[in-house]
Regions:
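Conserved beta-strand positions in repeat-built beta-propeller and related beta-rich domains
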Residues: 25, 32-36, 71-76, 129-134
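Structural signal for beta-propeller blades
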Residues: 38-41, 77-80, 136-138
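Blade-level signature of beta-propeller repeat domains, shared across WD40, Kelch, NHL, RCC1
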Residues: 133-172
Length: 172
């Protein structure tokens, strides 16, 4: 990559090649990824970009977690945690009977589809909230690799829960 100063002429082209969909800041720096980055990238305080780990194409919400990486593997319709030693967790994103879905088949691109994992926040180190289509929030347990509970707001296939955050900051 290249450094970009918005106060100067030039810079990157006005295109969305990487489809950045996650930015996270912690004590180690800034992490970001997108559908087409192929990696979870780390930005250091010296503005150097490095690869934290590789990622499959088409994932959302990738973030460092317990020395590994946690993300919505959107193409596989699962929440996936991969530890550095190769161990991890795979939990299916919930789906519903096709006949119960509203607006199914509205486009030929298959963008509006169920099981589309898009939204993730940590509740504890082992418990994760994810968003998915159609309009579903699920609470997942990485240790037992199962969905603990969830709520579906509508069966309109065109809608997916994107941004999630714990509030208050930590649950007791």
């Amino acid at each position: 990559g290249q450094r970009f100063d918005p106060g100067t002429k030039g810079g990157p082209p006005f295109v969305n090649n990487y489809h950045i969909n996650m930015v996270m800041v912690n004590d180690d720096g800034v992490y970001f990824s997108g559908l087409n980055t192929g990696a979870l990238l780390a930005l250091s305080s010296s503005m150097d970009v490095s690869e934290y780990c590789s990622l499959p194409r088409g994932c959302h919400n990738a973030r460092p977690h317990l020395g590994g990486v946690l993300f919505n593997d959107t193409r596989s319709d699962v929440l996936r945690y991969v530890a550095r030693d190769g161990q991890g967790a795979i939990i299916p994103v919930p789906t519903f009977p096709p006949e119960s879905l509203e607006y199914r088949g509205v486009d030929d691109s298959n963008i509006a589809r169920q099981g589309f994992g898009r939204g993730l926040c940590m509740i504890t180190d082992q418990v994760v909230a994810i968003g998915s289509s159609p309009s579903t929030i699920s609470i997942m347990d990485l240790e037992s690799q199962r969905r603990l509970t969830g709520v579906n707001l509508t069966l309109d296939i065109r809608n997916a829960i994107h941004g999630l955050e714990c509030w208050p900051e930590r649950w007791s």
